[in-house]
Structure formats: structure tokens, C-alpha cells
Amino acid sequence: MNKGYPTNLTDNQWQILEKILDPTRRKRINPLRDIVNAMLYLIKTGCQWRMIPKDFPPYNTVYYYFRKWKNEGVLEDMMDTLREKVRVSMGKEDTPSLGIMDSRSVKTSHHVDSDRGIDGNKKIKGRKQQAVVDTLGLPMALAIHEANIHDSVGAVSVVKVMIDRFPRLRKILADGGYQGETLANIVKKDLGCELSVVLRPNESSKKFSVIPKRWIVERSFSWLENFRRVAIDYEFFSESSLAMLQIAFSAIMLKKLL
């Protein structure tokens, strides 16, 4: 294992992930710790799979595990487990009672031709990332769709991810882009909680104003700017983009734990 990269897991961090990714601790030609380190290097630097340094396992082996964990939901489970651990470490219940919803549009690379559109407001051709976070800014659910889909429609995909997972959830805060009875009814039916749309004091004003608690999810999106692989969407398929977000948020939460 190469120990020279700042993105490499510490021993304590690996002890946490090992219980999630490798509970049997089976011997392998390429240790899973090295494979995870390669993924963390890739998402931080934004390099191509083939450009992963040679002192990591072969790039096709790393990609094999990325695809396997993506398809089997392992990366999502990892993100969820880390969120619960961070919450407990900060003296909170393992599941939140309040969620905060928002989205951001991200430009896709020129070679991406699927699951993308043009966000007319932001003038961005790419994909939209939907997120619901807790009051600590930790991700509860993520979804990705074409940037031209309105928030009130695209949010349904992230709501579906949350079904039967947050028994304490009572309210989700959102901005004016999520107005409408249709979405509110879906949230009530599927999650059993209230969707509270918080508007700025004057929606027609272009002056900046901080909306209580809404800044939390915006801060969560800003954390992702430290990871080049997700600052611009290079993935052919939105499922891979989602998996990259899950890895990035997992890396963020690992640092909060240790």
C-alpha cells in the first residue's frame, strides 16, 4: 500500500469502513483498503480511471469494485452508516427529525450525452443533483436527473429514496422551487411528514438574504467543491454520478469522525 497520498485512509478510518465493506476480512490479491484509497484519490483529483497511479491496484480492479458496490447499494449503505455514526458522536439521535432539501445544477463533460439537459435559470447544460440533508448538513438522500427538470418534479426521485428509512422524520424544509400540492402530497403520503416551503421575505427581490436553516444544505453542496470528480460531472450514466457523490460525502463524514 502506498502511504504517500493525503487521501489515503488512516488506520482508524479503515477500521470503521472495514466493518461495512469487508466484514469477513477475506484475504484478497488486492486489499480492499488499497482499492478504497484508489477511489478516494480519483474522486479528489478528478483523474481518469486509467490514470490512477500504478502503486494502487490495477484501475480495472478498482473500477470493478466501484461498479459492484454501486449496483449492490454498498456505497449508499456506507454513506448512511457514516451519517448515523457522525450524528451519534455529536450527541444526536441516529436518525433525524428534520430534513432540508435543495438542488444544484452541475455542468457535464462534453462527452456525456445521456441524462442531461439545460437549466434555463442557471444557464448550465448538465445534470441536477437533488439532496436532503439533516441539520448537520449530512446527506440523508441523494438523486440525480436532467438539469432541465423542475425541482418540484425532480424532488420526487429523492423522496422515493427516503421511504421507510427515517422513522423520526417530521418535516422537510425547502425553498420556493419546491412549491406545489403535488410534491407536498407525495411527501405526506410516502414519508408521513410535512413539506414546509420557506420563501425569502421578498421573492421578487434580487438582494441576498439568508433563509433560516436553508443555508445548511447549500454548505453541504459547497463541501463537494473540494472533490474535482464531482465539481464537473464526467460520468456517462447518472447512476455513476450518484455513486461518486456517495463516495465524496463518505470521505467528508470520515473526517468528521476522525
Predicted feature locations:
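Short alpha-helical elements
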Residues: M1-L258
